[in-house]
Amino acid sequence: MKNILDYTLEELTLWMKENNESSFRAKQIMSWIYKDVRNFSDMRNMPKSLIAKLEENFEIALPEIEEIYKSELDGTEKFLFKFSDGNLIESVLMRYKHGNSICISTQVGCRMGCKFCASTIDGRIRNLTTGEILAQILVVQNHIGERISNVVLMGSGEPLDNYENVMKFLDIVSAEYGLNIGQRHITLSTCGIVPKIYELADKELSITLAISLHAFSDEKRKEIMPIANKYSIDEILNACKYFVNKTKRRITFEYSLVKDVNDSKEDARALGKLLKGMLCHVNLIPVNEIKERTFKRSSKETIQDFANILSNLGIEVTVRREMGSDINAACGQLRRSYIKTQETRGE
């Protein structure tokens, strides 16, 4: 049975035509789904014959909430979801004065191998479908009874390694018939799959592109990010410049500061020189310490010095605000720790 959440309006309209149903029914069905109706029989303006066809061919498949961890400091909530095949993924809800933001996953695991990331330790298990990516937002919205206004594709997985499903997600999540979240309120984070950055640029979307850079030189980047063996920083920056030219959107460069690895004043000056003149912003991230890795986070003083150097070189820079520090877990850690707990219990 097919998950109707995987369908765009155009695809569902085509299905209606192929099954001798009126095309306008597709938009009505979408309206019900994104108003949180979870049973076709509850779609009151649908004829019984169509409801029967829908129930025969489709399901509205949503993951179960396996666990929720809520910060007592700022209300940040970390959700652990379980899909029907038993696979687990994580999403994080962050509450701000301007609205609710959610960080979602695009894959179960990840094959990129970044040394500071927990979600890549066991490799990529599978891609999430378009509907499974959307479902994270739908379930969280239903749980909190509030609208999600900002989406960040920065959870488990590399979005551009699941390109087709993620592009379809971007179509639906921003469409009026879908979740109607403006593209300017959506951020996609990538480790830098260069050909896909060009493809994304050609779509001329208004999303924010965030590049996980984390080093100023290929030599240093190769130490912590295997993708650097395939695509050089120059290639990534050229793709970013193409993206900026096509979309007129500022690029965000993410830079996780790791003690004694990439956090020196020389690193800061070299990074500033590398990015000077680009329409960009640097987001400095105190690295999350995970027990499977030896990386330690830089001191607050080192982070501030790094930020000051970039700022003095004319680079827009911010230090990422830590949310939910009392329930702190790096991306992928919640899933891994839960699986280990279940294995210990013999479940």
Swiss-Prot record:
Protein's job: Specifically methylates position 2 of adenine 2503 in 23S rRNA and position 2 of adenine 37 in tRNAs.
Catalytic site: E90 (proton acceptor), C331 (s-methylcysteine intermediate)
Molecular function terms, GO-annotated: 4 iron, 4 sulfur cluster binding; metal ion binding; rRNA (adenine(2503)-C2-)-methyltransferase activity; rRNA binding; tRNA (adenine(37)-C2)-methyltransferase activity; tRNA binding
Catalysed reaction, written as an equation: adenosine(2503) in 23S rRNA + 2 reduced [2Fe-2S]-[ferredoxin] + 2 S-adenosyl-L-methionine = 2-methyladenosine(2503) in 23S rRNA + 5'-deoxyadenosine + L-methionine + 2 oxidized [2Fe-2S]-[ferredoxin] + S-adenosyl-L-homocysteine; adenosine(37) in tRNA + 2 reduced [2Fe-2S]-[ferredoxin] + 2 S-adenosyl-L-methionine = 2-methyladenosine(37) in tRNA + 5'-deoxyadenosine + L-methionine + 2 oxidized [2Fe-2S]-[ferredoxin] + S-adenosyl-L-homocysteine
Cofactor(s) the record lists: [4Fe-4S] cluster
Annotated binding of [4Fe-4S] cluster, by residue: C110, C114, C117
Keywords: 4Fe-4S, Cytoplasm, Disulfide bond, Iron, Iron-sulfur, Metal-binding, Methyltransferase, rRNA processing, S-adenosyl-L-methionine, Transferase, tRNA processing
Methyltransferase in keyword set: yes
Chief location of this protein within or outside the cell: cytoplasm
Additional free-text comment from the UniProt record: Reaction proceeds by a ping-pong mechanism involving intermediate methylation of a conserved cysteine residue.
Broad enzyme group: transferase
Ranges where the Radical SAM core domain occurs: 96-326
GO biological process: rRNA base methylation; tRNA methylation
Cofactor stoichiometry and binding remark: Binds 1 [4Fe-4S] cluster. The cluster is coordinated with 3 cysteines and an exchangeable S-adenosyl-L-methionine.
Assigned EC number: 2.1.1.192
SS bond list: C103-C331
Name of the protein in its database record: Probable dual-specificity RNA methyltransferase RlmN
One GO term describing the cellular component: cytoplasm
